[in-house]
């Protein structure tokens, strides 16, 4: 559970307040999963980087492309320290986790992400979704390990989702899923 003396509270995020606001997600990584075609399918191997790397990307709360987003924040007082967001994909009855982020490196590995994951999983179950689904990158080894720890498995990937150079950039899109029913 939560390991700090302070009181952390999980609350629904108010769409009126947060919609359209941007944030930067950052992560550190020591390596990546190399995914390459083989004669009978695909081979996936972990490859360490020569030195640890930090990557980041900008994102937005309540992205316009989400069907009917549900979001929760982890707060210490009024300070937002973590965030999770998802929405039902009506066409296939899966709940897509569009974001889960503990915003400050110093707050990571303290259980915030796990509490947020349990909260959004319950919300997904309440929608009647058959499965949780999410996207991560082959170079985000900590995220992959976190999702596996929370019962997700790799269900697919796209070698060229972001650019024609994704394999060379070691940033291949990986889809991970967890059956709910």
Residue ranges, per PLM feature:
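Conserved glycine-rich acetyl-CoA-binding loop
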Residues: 79, 103-118, 122-127, 138-145, ...
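Acetyl-CoA-dependent GNAT
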Residues: 14-18, 22-99, 103-106, 117-119, ...
């Amino acid at each position: 559970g939560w390991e700090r003396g302070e009181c952390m509270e999980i609350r629904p995020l108010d769409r009126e307040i947060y919609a359209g606001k941007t944030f930067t997600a950052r992560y550190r990584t020591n390596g990546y999963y190399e995914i390459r075609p083989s004669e009978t399918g695909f081979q996936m191997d972990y490859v360490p980087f020569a030195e640890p790397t930090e990557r980041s990307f900008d994102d937005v709360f309540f992205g316009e492309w989400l069907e009917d987003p549900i979001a929760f924040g982890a707060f210490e007082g009024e300070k937002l320290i973590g965030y999770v967001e998802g929405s039902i994909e009506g066409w296939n009855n899966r709940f897509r986790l569009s974001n889960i982020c503990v915003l400050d490196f110093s707050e990571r590995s303290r259980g915030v992400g796990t509490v947020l994951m349990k909260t959004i999983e319950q919300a997904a179950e309440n929608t009647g979704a058959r499965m949780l689904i999410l996207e991560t990158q082959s170079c985000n080894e900590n995220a992959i390990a976190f999702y596996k720890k929370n019962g997700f498995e790799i269900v697919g990937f796209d070698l060229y989702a972001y650019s024609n150079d994704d394999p060379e950039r070691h940033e291949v899109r990986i889809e991970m899923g967890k059956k709910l029913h």
